[in-house]
Amino acid sequence: MKLSTSLEMPFRESTDPICSVCNFSSLIAPHFGGLVCSACASFFRRTVALNIHYLCKKDNQCKGMRKNCRACRFESCVKIAGMKRSLVKERKNLNNIPLYILNRRNETGNQGVVRAFVSSNQNRLENRLSLSPLTELPINDEMDVSKILKTTPSSLLKYYVEQVSHGKQFYMNTLNIRTKEELFEIVSYQSKVAAETCRTCPGVDLLDNRDILILRKYFQFSNIWIESTWKYWFSNDFSNDTEKFDIKLMEFIGQVKSTLLISLSRLKFNIFEFTAFKAICIWKLVYHETSRAMKIVAQEHYEGVTKALISYYQTYTLLDSMEIAIRVGEITLLVSSVFQMYHDMAKLYLHMGLPF
């Protein structure tokens, strides 16, 4: 099944009219004085209601502005579609306003929030790991403590973020290796890292030794292949040495690059999104192989991480409820490709004589 890997809806032939703002074929209707699609109407309403002012690095001359340049998109809402700011009602419920907007209002009154364009330098690893301090994860969930995991959703996501941002790293990315000896070295190293991670993972104290050994296997897999693929995406360390390589290993790495790597490059996860994706992969894989106790713990992790991610979107991004639902759906859907990757990895390990 072909997976959609962006926030855009997949292309389809349609007789629907074209939205004058985004130029996409869609159902259009009157919104705030203009005829536009529901997505552009939602974008306009949110921008005006929160008093946000976008900046464009091309002086509002961007082409194909949908989702790419919000400044040009908003300008098109006003100048092309004729939408009127005066028809948007002010938000009175403060619970529906992102925290950074409220903080900005407290500092400057209601002068508006300026959102600049994103620098291309932010595609590098060090900038992705500092998109938002760990302390900025949603923390207003003290009453939402999991009785099973004994932690809140935000603390759970923070636990996984710290594993990615501050965890022990091997000196070589898995997607750059060429021989089974190098893979053996990585597997040996990550086996120890996975054992350490499992000792501190919420809910592990409820599992028996067999379940813990299985969980370690999936933590190891996620470190070696999932996290390495994400970091490979924005790394400049690409190896082109093909003089000495293992054919089966190279075939599998090629498969990872043509599936997971392409999906990650299109979705452009920040560290919170990737961390949630990685955690969901681990516990979805675990869910189908273990005891009832493990299934309960796995479900708690899945629900906790998902809830924390949604809270992060609502608090620190400009995504509306529909965009958040689409984004979470994209992340969850991508997990299905990891299932096949895991099974193919198991075959590779058996072929190479690696412990599995």
From Swiss-Prot:
Domain NR LBD residue range list? 144-356
The record places its NR C4-type zinc fingers at: 19-40, 56-72
Major subcellular site: nucleus
Q: What are the protein's GO molecular function terms?
A: DNA-binding transcription factor activity; sequence-specific DNA binding; zinc ion binding
Q: Which InterPro entries match?
A: NHR-like_dom_sf, Nucl_hrmn_rcpt_lig-bd, Znf_hrmn_rcpt, Znf_NHR/GATA
- Regions recorded as binding DNA: 16-90
Q: Which UniProt keywords apply?
A: DNA-binding, Metal-binding, Nucleus, Receptor, Transcription, Transcription regulation, Zinc, Zinc-finger
Record keyword Nucleus present: yes
Q: Where in the cell is it found?
A: Nucleus
Q: Which GO terms describe its cellular component?
A: nucleus
Q: Per its database record, what is this protein's job? A: Orphan nuclear receptor.
Family the entry assigns? Belongs to the nuclear hormone receptor family.
Q: What is this protein called?
A: Nuclear hormone receptor family member nhr-169
